[in-house]
Amino acid sequence: MSITAERKSALIKEYATVEGDTGSPEVQVAILTERINNLTEHFKDHKKDNHSRRGLLTMVSSRRSLLDYLKKKDEGRYSKLISSLGIRR
């Protein structure tokens, strides 16, 4: 259900703006998207897991806030990120 350390490192390496960058909005959104996708798969088998569903909604809200911030600061980076992650907007 959670992402592995190797997968998280790969996401950080792929979306980092500079070496060792873990806090940029791109990296945070990529990690949240991976966690959201994992939880979405979890809910296909466990439809009544409402505790995890609340966590999913929190993650989606957090990702939306980060994307809004990125869109306000740099729309080019925003559009590149949502196209590479396949997020609708």
From Swiss-Prot:
Keywords: Ribonucleoprotein, Ribosomal protein, RNA-binding, rRNA-binding. The keyword Aminoacyl-tRNA synthetase does not apply. The gene is rpsO. It holds the Pfam family Ribosomal_S15. Gene3D superfamilies: 6.10.250.3130, S15/NS1, RNA-binding. The keyword Ribosomal protein applies. Belongs to the universal ribosomal protein uS15 family. It comes from Rhizobium leguminosarum bv. trifolii (strain WSM2304). One of the primary rRNA binding proteins, it binds directly to 16S rRNA where it helps nucleate assembly of the platform of the 30S subunit by binding and bridging several RNA helices of the 16S rRNA. InterPro entries: Ribosomal_uS15, Ribosomal_uS15_bac-type, uS15_NS1_RNA-bd_sf. It comes from the Bacteria. Disulfide bonds: none annotated. HAMAP family: Ribosomal_uS15_B. This is Small ribosomal subunit protein uS15.
